[in-house]
Amino acid sequence: MQKRVRNRLITIIICFCSACLGISIILYNLEKNIVFFLPPSKINEIEQGKELRVGGLVKTDSINKIADDKISFVITDNIKDFEILYQGTLPTLFRKGQGIIAIGQLSNGKFIARQLLAKHDENYRPPQ
């Protein structure tokens, strides 16, 4: 009887340790995806060249058209402002005061976005 209880206890301990190890590996690999985007106040110069997702509101009167498909604008989280350069087609919902998420890299103090995602509330209706 004693040997049977000891074997069960060892099996339970091994299963528990395996589960902890599996959860640790999953959380480590999902680390960069747990937080979908960073606000401008959390961006540091240390993250140069690293792929980032930055989110905030497009600041009023900050949208500057540089070329046909190249624009510059500022996003804010009401703590810090952050300049973004983007080349490409703008999302339909892009406008001043709108929440956006920019995906790209920090280069020389400016954020070069390769993709823009416009955020919307729960009342979104596609254009007709």
Swiss-Prot record:
Question: Extracellular side of the membrane: what ranges?
Answer: 30-128
State any GO BP term from the record.
cytochrome complex assembly
GO MF terms here are: heme binding; metal ion binding
Is Coiled coil given among the entry's keywords? no
Q: Which SUPFAM superfamilies match?
A: Heme chaperone CcmE
User: Do you know which Pfam families this protein is assigned to?
Assistant: CcmE
- Which stretches are Cytoplasmic in the membrane topology? 1-8
The portions of this protein that span the membrane are 9-29
UniProt keywords (A-Z) are: Cell membrane, Cytochrome c-type biogenesis, Heme, Iron, Membrane, Metal-binding, Signal-anchor, Transmembrane, Transmembrane helix
- Key word Membrane present in the record? yes
Q: Which residues does the annotation say bind heme?
A: 120, 124
The organism sits in which domain of life?
Bacteria
Q: Where in the cell is it found?
A: Cell membrane
The record gives the membrane topology as: Single-pass type II membrane protein
A GO cellular component annotation in the UniProt record = plasma membrane
Its main localization is: membrane
Q: What does this protein do?
A: Heme chaperone required for the biogenesis of c-type cytochromes. Transiently binds heme delivered by CcmC and transfers the heme to apo-cytochromes in a process facilitated by CcmF and CcmH.
The entry's family comment says: Belongs to the CcmE/CycJ family.
Return the protein name.
Cytochrome c-type biogenesis protein CcmE
* Gene it is expressed from: ccmE
